[in-house]
UniProtKB/Swiss-Prot annotation:
Binding site for Mg(2+): T66
EC class: hydrolase
Record-listed DNA binding positions: R309, R314
This protein's name: Holliday junction branch migration complex subunit RuvB
Signal peptide: none
UniProt catalytic activity: ATP + H2O = ADP + phosphate + H(+)
Stretch list, region Large ATPase domain (RuvB-L): 1-181
One term of GO molecular function: ATP hydrolysis activity
Organism of this sequence: Campylobacter jejuni (strain RM1221)
Length: 335
């Protein structure tokens, strides 16, 4: 599903985001409580000349978990090695990564909830005792070889904290949940990013882009790049509100940040007249798989009160009817 408001990373996002990503906490906008606590923990660890405790970042995609991991690396003066759980298929894959770490390194594992139970078992002693237990052979002849590891910090990122096993979650000494951004915060991010793109973004233009970015920096920056294209074609050094509106309307992103897929989803629910629709039925109607519905379409709609998720299925809220300019009929329980 190719959507400009897609929360998951596009292949080009890595390079693009890196060029616009802040390198320290001074340049990082938003998530103030998390920044404040991390600053304290980093200062304390440096004062004791120790590694940071292991850190778990959770929350919807695109809110800055990877950026925070890189900032922690910078602030600690440590090297960071990055991987994703789907890349770690065998215990040997993880062992190779761990044995190549140096003292004080940071290991960042994205989508950590996708680690298999067998991989988690290898990770437990590495996190707790900085030790790797490798089993050689099988059956009665099997032997366990213990390999000491350098002290390191594991930073895990997940969009589905509930899928982490309790033993793994409990081994993270610091756990933070990232929240959706305010439009004012996104506007500041956009204006700073525009300067790196050799553009000036007017405040009203930045707010217009922010308003349509689903409260997510990754989407905001992606939209900014497309708006910049419209400005470049018209030989404009300043991104105006008029140009931003033109670009965003052309991209099919409305004033609420909805695209055609969101509108189809909401139209399906509102047509049901507040009768719950199951996830499988929604996926079939939209010709999408269930994971895409849950991970890509629903998080923003749920967080902003457009839909409700019940045991029987999904229901459109009064806010959805308003967004689609439809009449909302109260249920018996609401009257």
């Amino acid at each position: 599903m190719d959507r400009i408001v897609e929360i998951e990373k596009y292949s080009f996002d890595e390079t693009y985001e890196t060029s616009l990503r802040p390198s320290n906490f001074d340049g990082y906008i938003g998530q103030e409580s998390i920044k404040k606590n991390l600053n304290i923990f980093i200062a304390a660890a440096k004062k004791r000349n120790e590694c940071l405790d292991h850190i778990l970042f959770s929350g919807p995609a695109g809110l800055g978990k990877t950026t925070l991991a890189n900032i922690i690396s910078y602030e600690m003066g440590a090297n960071i090695k990055t991987t994703a759980a789907p890349m770690i298929e065998k215990s040997g894959d993880l062992a190779a990564i761990l044995t190549n770490l140096s003292e004080g390194d940071i290991l960042f594992i994205d989508e950590i909830h996708r680690l298999s139970p067998a991989i988690e078992e290898v990770l437990y002693p590495a996190m707790e005792d900085y030790r790797l237990d490798i089993i050689i052979g099988s059956g009665p002849a099997a032997q366990t070889i213990k390999i000491d590891l350098p002290k390191f910090t594991l930073i895990g990122a997940t969009t589905r904290a509930g899928m982490l096993s309790n033993p793994l979650r409990d081994r993270f000494g610091m756990q933070f949940r990232l929240e959706f951004y305010k439009d004012s915060e996104l506007a500041l991010i956009l204006q700073k990013a525009a300067l790196k793109l050799n553009k000036t973004c007017e405040e009203k233009a930045a707010l217009e882009i922010a308003k349509r970015s689903r409260s997510t920096p990754r989407i905001a920056l992606r939209l900014l790049k497309r708006v910049r294209d419209f400005a470049d074609v018209n030989d404009e050094e300043i991104i105006t509100e008029k140009r931003a509106n033109e670009a965003l309307n052309s991209l099919g992103v409305n004033e609420l940040g909805f695209d055609a897929m969101d509108l189809r989803y909401l139209e399906l629910l509102t047509a049901a007249k507040q009768k719950p629709i199951g996830l499988a039925s929604i996926a079939a109607a939209l010709s999408e798989d269930e994971n895409t519905i849950e991970d890509v379409i629903e998080p923003y709609l749920l967080a902003n009160g457009y839909i409700e998720r019940t045991a029987k299925g999904r229901i459109a809220s009064a806010k959805s009817y308003s967004a689609l300019k439809l009449n909302y009929e109260k249920t018996l329980f609401e009257e």
